[in-house]
Amino acid sequence: MSGGEVVCSGWLRKSPPEKKLKRYAWKRRWFVLRSGRLTGDPDVLEYYKNDHAKKPIRIIDLNLCQQVDAGLTFNKKEFENSYIFDINTIDRIFYLVADSEEDMNKWVRCICDICGFNPTEEDPVKPLGNSSQAPVDSPFAGNTAPASTQLEASPVTLPPSYQLISLPPHPDTLGLQDDPQDYLLLINCQSKKPEPTRTHADSAKPTSSETDCNDNVPSHKTPASSQSKHGVNGFFQQQMLYDCPPSRAASVSVDSSLYNLPRSYSHDVLPKESPSSTEADGQLYIFNTPSGTSSVEAQMRHVSISYDIPPTPGNTYQIPRTFPEGTLGQSSKLDTIPDIPPPRPPKPHLTHDRSPVETCGAPRTASDTDSSYCVPTAGMPPSRSNTISTVDLNKLWKDASSQDCYDIPRTFPSDRSSSLEGFHNQSKIKNVLTVASVSGEEPDENYVPMNPNSPPRQHSSSFTEPIQEPNYVPMTPGTFDFSSFGMQVPPPAHLGFRSSPKTPPRRPVPVADCEPPPVDRNLKPDRKAKPAPLEIKPLPEWEELQAPVRSPITRSFARDSSRFPLSPRPNSVHSTTSSSDSHDSEENYVPMNPNLSSEDPNLFGSNSLDGGSSSMIKPKGDKQVEYLDLDLDSGKSTPPRKQKNSGSGSSMADERVDYVVVDQQKTLALKSTREAWTDGRQSTESETPTKSVK
């Protein structure tokens, strides 16, 4: 024991180190507070395993203490209603739990007396005491309102400066009745006056006390909203339940939703409330603005209804340009067809004296058959009619006048000499394209109908049948996907379609689209999945359970740094590490501190006397002695690394006999040495095998 005077002693529960707050238990220890003012010894706080132990587990130097906090809280079930205080030192914070509040206050007072600590300035107890007295005095501030109203309103409406100043009752009543009079009288008006009187007073009588109260409130908002309420509902007593008048936006929105007729001055509007009536005009203007806008919109909507719907690009050109007589009749008939083909129209005035057989006899070029992939229209030939003679034009357009068959799905003809009846209209138009190609244009120009610059072709795309034929080429190639074109019935390559230089090349299908989905090998039956790797965190566990924190009743004590400077760390304080409490797992953490191990000469001093054969002080010395024996006694014939492996156990030595030269005497000596140390025998029993090794 130290030689200081015992100031205080008792049982306290001590916390483990901060990094072990969650993993280790808070153990009950016997604490002794010693003062060395009379004896010259340092002021220390010692704790023992029990009250009759002779050697302390640890000595806390109070000269290194920085602060003491009392009344902490800890979010743990066993410490919910405990009395916790801490001793904050340079090395560590000790959290101590007392059995009662008196016991805690006694320990804190004694420690503060020895250390010379004073309460800190940021003590939260004083503001709590002042604030707790304020609501008690505030109900006596004003007695103009009922008791229930005053108790509810005074903590909110009174400024905080009046709560802090303690004045006599009568001057306090007079002083507080001037400034917050607006709010108090407004509440009184709500509670005292009945609904009919209140309604009539606000709309007709300007001399009543209630109206005078409203004059103090922003009156340019309240009368306008109340007037509109009166015009709609006939009473507005429920609106006055608000503490402050509603905003203009709220009143306008309510009026516009309920108001049907323009406002007038038929209500009893007072001359005093002229700003309110002025604002009513402003609200009338605001209200009429949406109605005017809606009337304009209604007119525009009426115009848009009478006006036809804007036509689609296919319906833009309803009357083609200068066409022959047959062309005009045929194109005007086709232009009126909507997007979905209607029933077959009546026969035109031109006679259909052409049969499908005559169509097959018309001369064709090699690329003529490729034109079957384009839907012919009446608008395509006129753009090229300047290159055709008059006789051929009349003949060919008589053939084109019989183009009225869109009901049969078109298929690719297997033979050039025979075609279906549904192809007779296409074949006749192909004759036009064939004659046009003779006039100096290439055979690949048969795909010129895909040019989007031709207006009749844009129109013709509006009544085509892209659903019935997948190989259909639209007249606007900008929106057509050539990757899917010709996948079902591809055109022959010898007809020149694929080799056409002006036809966009077919985009190859991406390989990623054809790949199968990835295989989930975890779905195989009887598959042994690898276990997920364990997430080993360094030391985050102590962060999950926070240390005891400050509470509203926490009191902090610290010394004045100007009057009591911190003394340097003494070297003789931490010399009591070893004790009879060797099984205390939390205290085994203390010698791992580098400062303690370097300053304590008796910790490992006995090991160096006998060359590692002294009595065991800590079980940590096993590895040190074992590695010293292996390093110093490694034979010359074998490297030290293999000698270590051979000495790790009998099984390892037996395995390496086949290919490593092993000294049997050294192997047995190392084996017996290891068994002696692991069994916890005395050093005298292990001296014989150790010397035999040497």
UniProtKB/Swiss-Prot annotation:
Keyword entries, A-Z: Acetylation, Phosphoprotein
Keyword check for Nuclease: no
CDD domains in UniProt: PH_Gab1_Gab2 (cd01266)
GO-annotated cellular components: cytoplasm
Compositional bias of kind Basic and acidic residues: 194-203, 672-684
Post-translational modification as stated in the protein's UniProt record: Phosphorylated in response to FGFR1 activation. Phosphorylated on tyrosine residue(s) by the epidermal growth factor receptor (EGFR) and the insulin receptor (INSR). Tyrosine phosphorylation of GAB1 mediates interaction with several proteins that contain SH2 domains. Phosphorylated on tyrosine residues by HCK upon IL6 signaling.
PROSITE patterns cross-referenced by the UniProt entry: PH_DOMAIN (PS50003)
Chain positions found as Phosphoserine: 251, 253, 266, 304, 402, 454, 651, 683
Region (Disordered): 125-147, 194-230, 324-386, 441-471, 491-658, 671-694
GO MF annotation list: signaling adaptor activity
Modified residues (Phosphotyrosine): 627, 659
Keyword Acetylation: yes
Disulfide partners: none
Start and end residues of each PH domain: 5-116
Highest taxon of source: Eukaryota
Modified residue annotations for N-acetylserine: 2
Sequence ranges of Polar residues compositional bias: 205-230, 456-465, 594-616, 685-694
Listed SMART domains: PH
Biological processes annotated in GO: signal transduction
Residue list for modification Phosphothreonine: 387, 638
Function recorded in the entry: Adapter protein that plays a role in intracellular signaling cascades triggered by activated receptor-type kinases. Plays a role in FGFR1 signaling. Probably involved in signaling by the epidermal growth factor receptor (EGFR) and the insulin receptor (INSR). Involved in the MET/HGF-signaling pathway.
Family of the protein in this entry: Belongs to the GAB family.
Binding partners and assembly: Identified in a complex containing FRS2, GRB2, GAB1, PIK3R1 and SOS1. Forms a tripartite complex containing GAB1, METTL13 and SPRY2. Within the complex interacts with METTL13. Interacts with GRB2 and with other SH2-containing proteins. Interacts with phosphorylated LAT2. Interacts with PTPRJ. Interacts (phosphorylated) with PTPN11. Interacts with HCK.
Protein name: GRB2-associated-binding protein 1
Native source species: Mesocricetus auratus
Gene of this entry: GAB1
